């Protein structure tokens, strides 16, 4: 779901950032590890202004998701998976923990697939290599 209530397929979401290195964060407003990691995400954004950031929420309701975006002042593209962690999207990426970070290079190739909140050094290192 998009922030204006529309629907978008994951492949179309990826097309929006074609030609740019992209960090996808899978998160939820109720996830304490996600909230704790927000300052690190903002630091990544400040250090890598050339990178597109896409946030995919696992929240159960759009109200909580949208409130979480505003509360944490998240900058980037925002989407909500309608079926939470165990749904189609979660199963497709073998989602077992959030936050989850996925990095795509400028061609759309996945270069980092299973990073979590403890992997910010690896995330930063990967982004530096893609400059």
Where are the predicted features?
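Short acidic active-site motifs
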Residues: 9-12, 64, 85-89
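Conserved N-terminal glycine/acidic-rich loop preference
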Residues: 19-22, 71-76, 123
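Short pre-active-site segment immediately N-terminal to redox-active cysteine/selenocysteine motifs
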Residues: 20-22, 26-30, 97
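Hydrophobic, well-ordered secondary-structure elements that form the walls
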Residues: 24, 65, 101
